[in-house]
């Protein structure tokens, strides 16, 4: 009898320095947690934390804060999960991380968080209702299967300008000379 291991491989196209990924899927039960009945994150569990911290959330490798590679530039809290976009600056570690992303070494994401409010689901699983997001990590083995790198691309002009607020009306008419 032979055992076969089938791996799902994905092709992540590298076109820039922004990593986009589903940091945590909603309503997916993980059993790679201390609770024997599992744990799942409810929709918008991180909404308050994201509102407070915004782009001051960092991306590191394997939850090692000494290997921080990127900073959040945008969040999308959709029905499937919390999607984050992180910008990698130039640097030896960041450049190597981009190469490793292209080679499939970092296919998944994981969140470090502190639960603020939890409840129990009908199946006994811990349901995280509200949590404080500490950081996000690129990992090889996620706690939640749906937490995955979705793309690596160039920053969109709108995502770079989102945090600046509305554009002010400025009169660019030349001023008359008085001398």
Located regions from the model:
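Short, charged/polar surface micro-motifs in flexible loops or helix N-caps
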Residues: 26-29, 64-67, 90-93, 117
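Catalytic zinc-binding patch centered on the HExxH motif and its immediate surroundings
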Residues: 70
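Residue microenvironments linked to proteolytic maturation
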Residues: 8-18, 73-167
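Conserved short "hinge" loops at termini or chain/domain junctions
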Residues: 25, 59, 63, 77-79
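Pocket-edge structural micro-motifs
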Residues: 22-23, 61-63, 86, 140
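Polar/acidic, low-complexity leader/linker segments enriched in S/T/G and N/D
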Residues: 1-52, 157-169, 178
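Short conserved beta-strand and strand-loop elements enriched in small hydrophobics
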Residues: 54-63, 109
């Amino acid at each position: 009898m032979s055992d076969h291991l089938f791996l799902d491989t994905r092709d992540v196209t590298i076109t820039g320095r922004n990593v986009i990924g589903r940091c945590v899927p909603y309503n997916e039960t993980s059993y790679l947690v201390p609770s024997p009945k599992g744990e799942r994150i409810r929709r918008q569990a991180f909404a308050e934390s994201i509102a407070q911290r915004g782009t001051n959330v960092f991306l590191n490798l394997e939850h090692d804060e000494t290997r921080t590679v990127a900073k959040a530039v945008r969040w999308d809290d959709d029905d499937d999960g919390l999607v984050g976009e992180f910008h990698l600056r130039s640097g030896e570690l960041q450049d190597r991380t981009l190469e490793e992303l292209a080679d499939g070494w970092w296919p998944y994401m994981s969140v470090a968080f502190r639960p603020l409010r939890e409840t129990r689901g009908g199946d006994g699983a811990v349901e995280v209702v509200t949590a404080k997001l500490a950081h996000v990590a690129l990992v090889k083995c996620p706690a939640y299967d749906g937490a995955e790198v979705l793309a690596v691309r160039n920053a969109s002009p709108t995502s770079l300008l989102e945090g600046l607020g509305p554009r002010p009306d400025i009169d660019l008419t030349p001023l008359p000379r008085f001398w």
